[in-house]
Amino acid sequence: MNTTPDTPTPRALRELTPLEARILGVLVEKQHTVPDTYPLSLNALTAGCNQKTARAPVMNVSEDEVTTALDELKRLSLVMEGSSSRVPRFEHNMNRVLGIPSQAIALLTILLLRGPQTAAELRLNSARLHGFADISSVEAFLDELAARAQPLVVRLPRAPGARENRWMHLMCGDVNMADFASADAGGGADSVPPSEFEALKAEQKRLADEVARLNALVQRMASELGIDVDAPGDAS
C-alpha cells in the first residue's frame, strides 16, 4: 500500500506527550464523526479528550492543559488555529506533517485514542474514519507505518492464547517489548485485551442506541396512527 504521489514528504518529529497524542486523535475523529462542528472549539476539544467511551486511558484534563498542549502542537505544525471565527477553532495537519495517506491516518488515530489494538479491532473501530475492505488491507498500511525511517507503529508480542498480535503507536516514543510480553503472559489465555473490551462496549452502546432510536420511531408512528402499542393484545 504505497502512498499516493501527492502525499507530502514526512518530517522528523519529537516524541509527543500523552495529551498531545490524545488531542491529535480527537481532532481526526471529530473531523469525520461530527464534521459540522469541525474545526473544534477549545471546549469541544477538551470534552473529546475527557470522553469516557472509546478512550484508553480515560483522561481528565482542563482547558488550560489542553491550551498548553495545543501551543506545542502548533509549533510542530501538527495543529492549526483558524481565524475566521470569533471563537478559536483548531484542526489537525497530520497528513501533511507525517506524510501518510488518509487510510494510515485513520488507523493511527484509533491507536492514539484506544491504545493497543489487533488488526481486526482496528478495522472495526476505524469504520467511521475509513472503510477497509478486509483485514489484509489494514495490515498492509500498518506494515508501511512500521517500516518508516521513523516508525509510527509497532507490532507487539502476541499474548498467550491470543490469535492475533496487537499494534501500538510510537508517537509518544519507543515501547519496551519485554514489558508487554510479561504483562500479556501474566494475564493468562482467558484474559480479554482492554482494547477488545472497549470495542465490545462501544458496539454494545451502538446497538443500544439503535434500539432506542427504533423504539422512538415505532412510538411516533403508532401515535400518528392512533395505535396504543403498550395496550395488551387481543386474546380472542
Curated annotation (Swiss-Prot):
Q: Record's InterPro entries? A: DUF480 (IPR007432), WH-like_DNA-bd_sf (IPR036388), WH_DNA-bd_sf (IPR036390)
Extract the SUPFAM superfamilies matched here. Winged helix' DNA-binding domain (SSF46785)
Superkingdom is Bacteria
State one Pfam family annotation.
DUF480
Residue ranges the record marks as coiled coil: none
Q: Which family does it belong to?
A: Belongs to the UPF0502 family.
Q: Which protein, by its recorded name, is this?
A: UPF0502 protein Bcen2424_5610
* Taxonomic lineage of the native organism: Bacteria, Pseudomonadati, Pseudomonadota, Betaproteobacteria, Burkholderiales
